[in-house]
Amino acid sequence: MAIKINEKGRGKFKPAPTYEKEEVRQLLMEKINEEMEAVATATSDISNDEIQYKSDKFNVLSLFCGAGGLDLGFELAGLEQSLGTDKALEAFKDRDVYNAIRHESVFHTVYANDIFSEALQTYEKNMPNHVFIHEKDIRKIKEFPSANLVIGGFPCPGFSEAGPRLVDDERNFLYIHFIRCLMQVQPEIFVAENVKGMMTLGGGEVFRQIVEDFGAAGYRVEARLLNARDYGVPQIRERVIIVGVRNDIDFNYEYPEITHGNEEGLKPYVTLEEAIGDLSLDPGPYFTGSYSTIFMSRNRKKKWTDQSFTIQASGRQAPIHPGGLPMEKVDKNKWIFPDGEENHRRLSVKEIKRIQTFPDWYEFSDGGNMKVSVNNRLDKQYKQIGNAVPVFLARAVAKSIAQFAADYLKDNHPHEAPQMKLFI
């Protein structure tokens, strides 16, 4: 099977040549070597003294942390492990109550890294103040803090089915630095998240190589496609969850059992009505403006009794609010609003935050630049929310790890704070 490879020329994309599947591995190896050579010239700018470890917790290192959806879900699962589900979920509704007990979680995040300023501003507003927040390109980070658990959703535009899918898109190789972190830190467990499209890029060869590369770092690796709506998220959102357990650790990770669905014995799917129905009178700010021909080429509006379309990292691409008449298909690639465009709007920031299962108290930064348009500032919030892992999906993924962590800490209680390890 031939695979498209990106070729740049004069600032534009030339027609892509084709490579056979056996050539993909060689291409990946070349890219890995390029990335490793680049990091060799980096300098360290953090010290172990700046990292606030806890010897009685499972210390967590977060890569590509974004606004903190994955981190918050893990913290919540760790709190449920310590205090019970009812108490943790009740506290989760209120910022002050949650902040007062969040330190009880078995997970303790010590470090978070990203390059997007607004996302890190959001992270700092909402996550514990002991976390060392590192705004730096991961390709220029020479050494990472020690941790028991490394988590992260490495950037995925190059894998996305929503746009061009080119094997050598440079964004496809940031996972190498996740693996570099694993080789240096050697955490007991890691969890990586990515889009569904990574499984089929290059006929599946790229995905197979990525899983193999993670395993080569010293881990037993599993990967599975999960749908967020199966775990109480009011949204159809499929994501690949890759979990690795260090080869010497006696733990077999179990993917979460489905909790929501139409089958007997499961809770019903959470609907848009349940998630955002109470916000109709006070939805908060939302992205305004016309709809493109591409946007109107398919249905963008769900019923109140449905789950949302996947929330995208764009205000302009936000789904339409479920109120009013449904959209109508009038041609092969053309849908309309039968009662007029003025009677419909995109989902608001507050609404998509709910759909991504963030609590209402979670504040998203818009960058604070009053010189740009309202839409521009709102789009920064939409982007953060759309890029995030739904909190309740992260919570489901984390539950069995939280149980393992609690048992592991009882049996392997460290007496000294871990030290940073330099990767050579």
Curated annotation (Swiss-Prot):
InterPro entries attached to this UniProt entry: C5-Methyltransferase (IPR050390), C5_DNA_meth_AS (IPR018117), C5_MeTfrase (IPR001525), C5_meth_CS (IPR031303), SAM-dependent_MTases_sf (IPR029063)
Active site positions, chain numbering: C156 (s-methylcysteine intermediate)
PTMs per UniProt: In the absence of DNA, can self-methylate two cysteine residues.
Domain of life: Bacteria
SAM-dependent MTase C5-type domain segment(s): 58-408
EC numbers, comma separated: 2.1.1.37
Catalysis: reaction(s): a 2'-deoxycytidine in DNA + S-adenosyl-L-methionine = a 5-methyl-2'-deoxycytidine in DNA + S-adenosyl-L-homocysteine + H(+)
Residues carrying S-methylcysteine: C181
Record key words, sorted: DNA-binding, Methylation, Methyltransferase, Restriction system, S-adenosyl-L-methionine, Transferase
Gene3D superfamilies membership: DNA Methylase, subunit A, domain 2 (3.90.120.10), Vaccinia Virus protein VP39 (3.40.50.150)
Transmembrane segments annotated in the record for this chain: none
Gene Ontology biological-process entries: DNA restriction-modification system; methylation; negative regulation of gene expression via chromosomal CpG island methylation
GO MF: DNA (cytosine-5-)-methyltransferase activity; DNA binding
Enzyme class (EC, first level): transferase
Pfam families in the cross-refs: DNA_methylase
Assembly and interaction partners: Monomer.
Protein family membership: Belongs to the class I-like SAM-binding methyltransferase superfamily. C5-methyltransferase family.
Protein name: Type II methyltransferase M.BspRI
Organism field: Lysinibacillus sphaericus (Bacillus sphaericus)
